[in-house]
């Protein structure tokens, strides 16, 4: 089983949409009723940032969105195909995203975690991310439970 990380192209948008929705359906189905994102939404992300894709034997199995913003970068939509979760793909992709942004001159990586996804605080905390505040959950997303984001950040050391 050979894995590789690459920068996604707009041609990958449909595959990325399916990957994100399958991962988030499992993880967030208890509080979100709809798909996490549609094809147009993924395509719009390509105008402001990039997706990295991890492929196993040339088949996309995980993706993450990164958006460099000067000395800071934003990371979001970390998604691993449900059947491949808990096998280190998320860590591999996080390492690649952090290195990519570091090479662009970013000093910090920022991300948001839904407060209801408590298991993610440990995952990101072990990777050096610390809580920096809160922000509102998008008002246009229908949720079954009230929720908000916990903002987290990490210094990208050299």
Segments from the language model and where they lie:
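A short beta-loop-alpha structural element at the N-terminal edge
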Residues: 4-16
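A short, internal acetyl-CoA/4′-phosphopantetheine-binding micro-motif in the GNAT/acyltransferase core
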Residues: 78-85, 113-114
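Glycine-rich acyl-CoA binding loop
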Residues: 75-76, 86-97
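Conserved GNAT-fold acetyl-CoA-binding loop/helix
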Residues: 17-47
């Amino acid at each position: 089983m050979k894995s590789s990380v690459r920068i996604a192209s707009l041609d990958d948008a449909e595959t990325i949409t399916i990957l994100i929705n399958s991962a988030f359906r499992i993880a967030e189905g208890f509080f979100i009723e709809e798909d996490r994102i549609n094809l147009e939404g993924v395509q719009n992300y390509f105008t402001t940032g990039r997706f990295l894709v991890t492929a196993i034997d040339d088949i996309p199995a995980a993706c993450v969105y990164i958006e460099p913003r000067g000395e800071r970068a934003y990371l979001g939509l970390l998604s691993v195909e449900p059947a491949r979760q808990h096998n280190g793909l998320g860590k591999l992709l996080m390492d690649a995203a952090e290195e990519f942004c570091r090479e662009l001159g970013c000093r910090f990586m920022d991300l948001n975690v839904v407060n209801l996804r408590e298991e993610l605080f440990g995952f990101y905390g072990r990777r050096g991310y610390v809580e920096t505040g809160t922000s509102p959950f998008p008002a246009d997303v229908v949720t079954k439970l009230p929720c908000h984001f916990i903002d987290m950040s990490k210094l990208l050391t050299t």
